[in-house]
């Protein structure tokens, strides 16, 4: 698999997952009518996306559950174990998750539905979204696998005719040899590239000494933490450990 390309989250849709029974939508689309904080907008391929966003709310309003949903999306795409659960107070066993993202300068949307009782992925859809010079968006369906309504589509007819008989206990990209199908191979590459760019940091228990020890030693983890902090603060140019005797303080007269 190729090295992960630059990716940016645009939208997340969640329905009947954890504390969310009704559908919720989280968007990183930038409202260009608002001229404030222009440095917080990333512009690429006619798309405008926020670099940083904050989620605020009282306790038990769903903030942690939303992060859990993103973690589940990442785990499922990377073929890792996930703790996805349907809403406790709903009789509906179908969890619905969707994500729109920018990867390598191109915009994609991936949706899937998971039956927590039968442990089947009953629906998958992958589309590429393009925008013309006038701002009009259009969708190009690469893959549709709808086991409930018996709707199957793929840009490659060789795989489209077999979608109805493929197992559903995992995502399609993990069930077939994608190397035999150009479209599925590209879908898998794009999805894994995107999911590999997702980092979830638990800030609840990080001792200051652990942070200092980490910053003393140059390695891949240190570089990752520094990049994360710099990206989270729009006005921070660098973040590093310096011995006390190397710190220069300019005193105003």
Regions found by a protein language model. Give the residues of each.
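Pre-Walker A-like glycine/lysine-rich segment at the N-terminus of P-loop NTPase domains
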Residues: 2-72
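Sterically constrained small-residue positions within well-ordered secondary structures
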Residues: 5, 17, 46, 88-90, ...
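Structured loops at beta-to-helix junctions and adjacent beta-edge loops in soluble globular domains
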Residues: 15-17, 29, 102, 176, ...
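Short acidic, glycine-rich loop/turn motifs
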Residues: 14, 99-105, 126-131
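Electropositive, glycine-dotted interaction segments
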Residues: 109-251
């Amino acid at each position: 698999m190729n090295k992960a390309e630059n990716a940016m989250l645009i939208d997340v849709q969640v329905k009947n997952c954890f504390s969310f029974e009704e559908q919720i939508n989280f968007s990183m689309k930038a409202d260009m009518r608002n001229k404030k904080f222009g440095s917080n907008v990333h512009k690429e391929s006619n798309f405008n996306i926020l670099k940083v966003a904050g989620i605020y709310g009282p306790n038990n309003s769903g903030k942690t559950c939303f992060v859990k949903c993103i973690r589940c999306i990442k785990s499922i795409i990377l073929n890792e174990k996930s703790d996805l659960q349907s809403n406790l107070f709903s009789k509906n066993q179908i969890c619905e998750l969707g994500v729109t993202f920018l990867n390598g300068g191109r915009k994609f949307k991936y949706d899937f539905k998971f039956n927590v009782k039968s442990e089947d992925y009953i629906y998958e859809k992958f589309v590429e979204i393009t925008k013309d010079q006038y701002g009009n968006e259009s969708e190009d369906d690469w893959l549709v696998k709808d086991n409930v309504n018996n709707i199957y589509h793929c840009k490659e007819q060789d795989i489209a005719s077999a979608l109805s008989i493929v197992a559903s206990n995992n995502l399609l990209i993990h069930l077939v040899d994608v190397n035999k199908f150009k479209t599925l191979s590209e879908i898998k590459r794009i999805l894994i590239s995107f999911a590999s760019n997702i980092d979830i940091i638990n800030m609840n228990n990080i001792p200051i000494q652990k942070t200092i020890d980490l910053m003393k030693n140059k390695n891949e983890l240190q570089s990752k933490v520094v990049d994360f902090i710099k990206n989270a603060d729009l006005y921070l140019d660098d973040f590093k450990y310096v011995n006390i005797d190397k710190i220069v303080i300019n005193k105003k007269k």
